Every structure is written in structure tokens, then in C-alpha cells.
Curated annotation (Swiss-Prot):
The lineage of its organism: Bacteria, Pseudomonadati, Pseudomonadota, Alphaproteobacteria, Hyphomicrobiales. Belongs to the UPF0161 family. Could be involved in insertion of integral membrane proteins into the membrane. Keywords: Cell inner membrane, Cell membrane, Membrane. The keyword Cell membrane applies. It is found in: Cell inner membrane. SMART domains: Haemolytic. PANTHER family: MEMBRANE PROTEIN INSERTION EFFICIENCY FACTOR-RELATED. This is Putative membrane protein insertion efficiency factor. Its main location: membrane. Coiled coil: none annotated. GO terms for cellular component: plasma membrane. It is a peripheral membrane protein.
Length: 129
């Protein structure tokens, strides 16, 4: 015997509203203000791409804090280069300690072709013999 549906199909879209609103604001920025001021981000991916991915992966609260930290790092005396969204949220992050979601300081990531050797022997062609 199957229980009748109580009409809870509306919950998932409602829970996605904050995430979609944050991503919508980034979309609006990318299509209005960004073309006017120019594309001059110091990082790859750009700050707006980073913010969109962080909010998509982690939601508006955690992704928003990650994006804020990235924007503060993207300044003349800040970092530059490759700065990807983390695959997982930091283990020490809690909703009531939001600053722990983000990396507030950072170092420039090395280019992929001079990355540190992993010990697998595939990087031997990078060094001259």
C-alpha cells in the first residue's frame, strides 16, 4: 500500500531560491557591469566565474563567503594566477563561523607546467638533463 503524496514537491525549489538568487546577481554583473569596466581579473577562473561555481557547489552562505574572500584577494597587492574553487568545504567550517569557509590569504599557484613532482616519474621531461 502506497501512502498518498502530501505535496512536498515544492520544498526543493524553495530551498534553491537563495542559491539561484546569488547566481542570478553574478549573471547580472557579468552581462551588464563587467563588459563596461573590462575583463581584468588577476585570477583564473575570473572572480565572477569563481563566485558562480562556489555558490553552485556550496550554496549562498558558504559560497558567498568564499567569493567575498576571493574578491578581497583580487587586488594589486593580492594573489594572482590559478585559484580554483575547493572540491569540498573546509572541515573546520561551521555555519555560525562563516569566515572559516574561505581562504583569506593565499599564495600564487605555480603554473601547471612547473608543478612540483608527485614522485610518479612523469615530470622528468620538465627538467633539462
Amino acid at each position: 500500500m502506497q501512502l498518498p503524496s502530501r505535496g512536498t514537491d515544492w520544498i526543493a525549489p524553495v530551498l534553491r531560491l537563495p542559491r539561484n538568487a546569488g547566481r542570478g546577481l553574478i549573471w547580472l554583473y557579468r552581462h551588464t557591469l563587467s563588459p563596461l569596466v573590462g575583463y581584468n581579473c588577476r585570477h583564473y577562473p575570473t572572480c565572477s566565474m569563481y563566485g558562480d561555481e562556489a555558490i553552485r557547489k556550496f550554496g549562498l552562505w558558504a559560497g558567498g563567503w568564499m567569493t567575498l574572500a576571493r574578491l578581497l584577494r583580487c587586488q594589486p597587492w593580492g594573489t594572482s594566477g590559478i585559484d580554483l574553487v575547493p572540491q569540498t568545504a573546509p572541515s573546520r567550517a561551521r555555519w555560525y563561523l562563516p569566515w572559516r569557509y574561505a581562504r583569506w590569504r593565499g599564495v600564487n599557484a605555480p603554473p601547471p607546467d612547473v608543478a612540483e613532482p608527485c614522485g610518479c616519474g612523469s615530470h622528468s621531461q620538465l627538467t633539462p638533463h
